[in-house]
Amino acid sequence: AVSRFTHIPGTQIVALCDYDPKRAEACQNILKKASMPKAAIYSGETGYEELCKRDDIDLVYIAADWLHHFPIAKCALENGKHVAIEVPSAMNLQECWDLVNLSETTRKHCFILENCCYDWFEMNTLNMAQNGVFGEVIRAQGAYIHNLSDFWDYYWKNGENDKLGWRLEFNMRHRGDVYATHGLGPV
């Protein structure tokens, strides 16, 4: 996620945050490779709160575990930051409305980074449809299947305090269909 921002001209990455300080520190290598200065590191359960209080941050990009997307976004908006959130942006309808209302109240942008709407395949298909390659499109259907078998070891929870094993539980609870926007968004 950090490497994406290093390719945007004029972007400065002044702070990084992860529950695990080693993971945040590892991102310094990405900045170094892009000839960017080191960023301040924040970590722990509430490290994002300190990051959001900084005056030199315009945008907080959130790529945390899903349960933390909303509280981090809320904190960032309340501290006058624009917010970009990987999907899902919230875990229930109330949190969605809270983000909408906070964004409107603070006059700060809050947007979902739905990569399955703007990735190469989706944009190529849109271009083909707009150029008549398929004729008149009268119906479309979307689906999303994500084979995560290569990542099961990473997603498996190794004890009660393991912060990285969160995703497998969501996949089991929701029949593996955890990204409704991935299949529906491009349609």
Where are these predicted regions, by residue range?
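Acidic-histidine catalytic/liganding microenvironments
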Residues: 5-8, 54, 119, 131
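Predominantly a Rossmann-like dinucleotide-binding segment in NAD(P)-dependent oxidoreductases
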Residues: 106-111, 116-187
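A short helix-to-beta-strand connector/capping loop
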Residues: 33-41, 105-109
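Beta-strand-loop-alpha-helix segment that lines the small-molecule cofactor/substrate pocket
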Residues: 59, 65-66, 70-118, 132
